[in-house]
Swiss-Prot record:
GO CC annotations, alphabetized: cytosolic small ribosomal subunit
Residues spanning the membrane: none
Alphabetized PROSITE patterns for the sequence: RIBOSOMAL_S2_1, RIBOSOMAL_S2_2
Organism: Pseudomonas aeruginosa (strain ATCC 15692 / DSM 22644 / CIP 104116 / JCM 14847 / LMG 12228 / 1C / PRS 101 / PAO1)
Protein's UniProt keywords contain Ribonucleoprotein: yes
Recorded family membership: Belongs to the universal ribosomal protein uS2 family.
Biological processes, Gene Ontology terms: translation
Gene: rpsB
Keyword match Amino-acid biosynthesis: no
UniProt xrefs under CDD domains: RPS2
Name of the protein in its database record: Small ribosomal subunit protein uS2
NCBIfam families registered for this protein in UniProt: rpsB_bact (TIGR01011)
Keywords, sorted A to Z: Ribonucleoprotein, Ribosomal protein
GO MF terms held by the record: structural constituent of ribosome
Pfam families found in the cross-reference section: Ribosomal_S2
Amino acid sequence: MSQVNMRDMLKAGVHFGHQTRYWNPKMGKFIFGARNKIHIINLEKTLPMFNEALTFVERLAAGKNKILFVGTKRSAGKIVREEAARCGMPYVDHRWLGGMLTNYKTIRQSIKRLRDLETQSQDGTFDKLTKKEALMRSRDLEKLERSLGGIKDMGGLPDALFVIDVDHERIAITEANKLGIPVIGVVDTNSSPEGVDYVIPGNDDAIRAVQLYLNSMAEAVIRGKQGAATSADEFVEEAPAESAEG
């Protein structure tokens, strides 16, 4: 089972919230106190909630479900991309396009356009075009890759969202809520936990904290997938023996 511990969280600075004047009262029960006008998050509360979220993700991955990693602010984007790719999950790291979930039909058409352009760039089609046309298509491809590259292999709506900084990604959460897609989110002291099914109270800015969340989630996905593969192997091994008896 995927687990995170108190020492890892302290080292990563998960307990440092935002300035006290920016606090959201809905996060009051997760705040331990204040130090130098900065709210300190109670990691005794975070620990079981973080581990519960990891267990949920591991279970989803074991069932071949898709978890969409979302983190579009500068401090998160690169790590979101790397960790999601490492565990084979879709991601949005650049900008959330309105309707990415609620208007998935249209998004799917844009993904098809992206795939067509990818093929054209590799099969020599671009070489046969005028310089201007080739340049326009290259720019199109670049733009589509940046905004949709992380979800081009998603193949349909995700089964859950994992979000870094719920305030920054509020549109994504609202869309997921409308469609009944569960949301796992890192919620800092200045944010609202509303609309988040699995709240992880913690610092959503520090690179080391963001790295810890994403690394732990990716590990949970990998563990879930490995568990599913192991049980599938066992099932295959047992199946012939049973049919031989029959």
